[in-house]
């Protein structure tokens, strides 16, 4: 797949051939969905907790005698049916993380990249560098080239001026290539890759 290379300012800077084994697959939505579910499950804090019957600080003495009152039989006031009693089958603090094979995770990333390429949502930059760390100027530049909702992936190390200028722009995410992930690719309209990121991805999946 051949695609044009542009600069941060939108000027043409050549073209590049993208590897079809990474960017030319027929996207499988099921793999992408599994990977997103895996990512979001890992992010959950899992700190939800309610008081169960055993956690309630209340006397365990029988409420009233078994027979002779005309009322239903009851033992502990900690039971769920009483006001102030414990929650039956309530949430407990736990990890929501689940396993997903490494090969499936790698394949899901390829399919997410292929889906973005198929939709015409990939932009290739020669680099992500600017002379000074000015958010106002970078935001105006993005608006000029129509980049309002994007994930920008650079090489192994981000250029300091660019990352500082971009980090306060809404709906613009900047990550090094090792941080590329399916969820962030899908949640943004455009995926911007520098040539350094392309080379790193092709080396990673070789």
Swiss-Prot record:
Biological-process GO terms, alphabetical: translation
Chain segments carrying region Disordered: 63-85
Subunit structure: Part of the 50S ribosomal subunit.
Organism per entry: Beijerinckia indica subsp. indica (strain ATCC 9039 / DSM 1715 / NCIMB 8712)
Keywords for the protein's UniProt record, in alphabetical order: Ribonucleoprotein, Ribosomal protein, RNA-binding, rRNA-binding
Gene giving rise to this polypeptide: rplD
Functional summary from the UniProt entry: One of the primary rRNA binding proteins, this protein initially binds near the 5'-end of the 23S rRNA. It is important during the early stages of 50S assembly. It makes multiple contacts with different domains of the 23S rRNA in the assembled 50S subunit and ribosome.
Molecular function via GO: rRNA binding; structural constituent of ribosome
Name under which the protein is recorded: Large ribosomal subunit protein uL4
Family affiliation: Belongs to the universal ribosomal protein uL4 family.
Pfam families: Ribosomal_L4
Assigned GO CC terms: ribonucleoprotein complex; ribosome
Superkingdom field: Bacteria
């Amino acid at each position: 797949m051949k695609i044009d290379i542009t600069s941060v300012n939108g000027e043409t800077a050549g073209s590049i051939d993208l590897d079809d084994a990474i960017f030319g697959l027929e996207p499988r939505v099921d793999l992408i969905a599994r990977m997103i579910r895996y990512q979001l499950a890992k992010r959950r804090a899992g700190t939800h907790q309610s008081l169960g019957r055993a956690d309630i600080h209340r006397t365990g003495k029988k409420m009233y005698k078994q027979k002779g009152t005309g009322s239903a039989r009851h033992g502990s006031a900690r039971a769920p049916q009483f006001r102030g009693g414990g929650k039956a089958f309530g949430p407990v603090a736990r990890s929501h993380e689940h396993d997903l094979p490494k090969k499936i995770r790698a394949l899901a990333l390829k399919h997410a990249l292929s889906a973005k390429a198929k939709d015409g949502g990939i932009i290739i930059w020669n680099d992500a560098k600017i002379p000074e760390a000015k958010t106002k100027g970078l935001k105006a530049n993005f608006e000029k080239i129509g980049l309002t909702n994007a994930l920008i992936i650079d090489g192994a190390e981000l250029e300091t001026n660019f990352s500082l200028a971009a980090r306060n722009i809404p709906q613009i995410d900047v990550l090094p290539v090792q941080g590329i992930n399916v969820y962030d690719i899908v949640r943004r309209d455009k995926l911007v890759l520098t040539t350094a990121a392309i080379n790193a991805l092709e080396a990673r999946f070789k």
